[in-house]
Every structure is written in C-alpha cells, then in structure tokens.
C-alpha cells in the first residue's frame, strides 16, 4: 500500500466563521492555525496547502490572560538606525484590532511560500459583519 499524498487540485476547501468575543488569543490562534494548515483533515499532506478558509469576526474583543495586556510587546522597525518601535497588546488592539491575532497565527504556520499562502486564507474583521456571506461559512465553535 502506498502512502497517500493529496494533489492541490483535489483539495476541497470549506469556509468557517469564528466569533472571537472573549476568546483567549493563544488558544484561538492555535485552532485557527490548525484549520489553515488542514491538520483536521484525513488528507493532510505537509507540503500541500490542504487547509480551509477562516473568517474571524469581533477580533477587537479578543482577550489575553494575566497582565499580558500591558506586558506583551510587539516590535517593528522603520529601517533606519535606531528606528525600533515597541507597542503593547492593549494599544495594538485599539489601533489595529486584527494584527495581534494575525501575528500569533503567522508564528504558528510554516515559514516560506506555503505559509504565506495559508495566511492569505485568514480573514479578520473588527465588527460582527464580514463580506464573505456568499461563501456560506459554517460557524466554528472554539
């Protein structure tokens, strides 16, 4: 018996919608990364993108445990000498609501072209509304 390897054109992608209200950042990101990679499917193949699309609503209501709202730091650099900027989780959520979740999920996906393709299937929205109703996403409880 040969080892099964999924073909890219044989993969059936589904759409899921997740309500992130009062969900913990890391636990939510772990399940989303798992869905984006396709590890929940029997046809999972590491070198093929077998994952599904995930739409996350209410990303502005994600929480973190403990004192991480103040202590968790995000860094970015302007490209100039001394141009490093530091922002905590609380300010990041106010300014860019979806970026904390995207950063957490990005760290859990493979690095390289395959990981970038998987990350494009993540859609984050601050409110309850999203423009993907035509895809008829299934509700996913996490």
Swiss-Prot record:
GO biological processes: negative regulation of translation; translation
Keywords: Ribonucleoprotein, Ribosomal protein
UniProt key word Ribonucleoprotein: yes
Coiled-coil portions: none
A molecular-function term among this protein's GO annotations: mRNA binding
GO cellular component term, pick one: cytosolic large ribosomal subunit
Keyword Nuclease applies: no
Pfam families found in the cross-reference section: Ribosomal_L13 (PF00572)
Physiological role: This protein is one of the early assembly proteins of the 50S ribosomal subunit, although it is not seen to bind rRNA by itself. It is important during the early stages of 50S assembly.
Subunit description: Part of the 50S ribosomal subunit.
Family recorded in the similarity comment: Belongs to the universal ribosomal protein uL13 family.
Protein name: Large ribosomal subunit protein uL13
């Amino acid at each position: 018996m040969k080892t099964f390897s999924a073909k890219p054109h044989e993969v059936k992608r589904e759409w899921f919608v997740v309500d992130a209200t009062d969900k913990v950042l890391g636990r939510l990101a772990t399940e989303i990364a798992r869905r984006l990679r396709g590890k929940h499917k029997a046809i999972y193949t590491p070198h093929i993108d077998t994952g599904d699309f995930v739409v996350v609503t209410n990303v502005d209501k994600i929480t973190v445990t403990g004192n991480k709202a103040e202590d968790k730091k995000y860094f970015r650099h302007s490209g100039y000498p001394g141009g490093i900027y530091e922002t905590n989780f609380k300010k990041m959520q106010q300014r860019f609501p979806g970026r904390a979740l995207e950063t957490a999920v990005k760290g859990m996906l493979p690095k390289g072209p395959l990981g970038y393709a998987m990350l494009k299937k993540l859609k984050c929205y601050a409110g309850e509304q999203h423009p993907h109703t035509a895809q008829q996403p299934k509700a996913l409880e996490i």
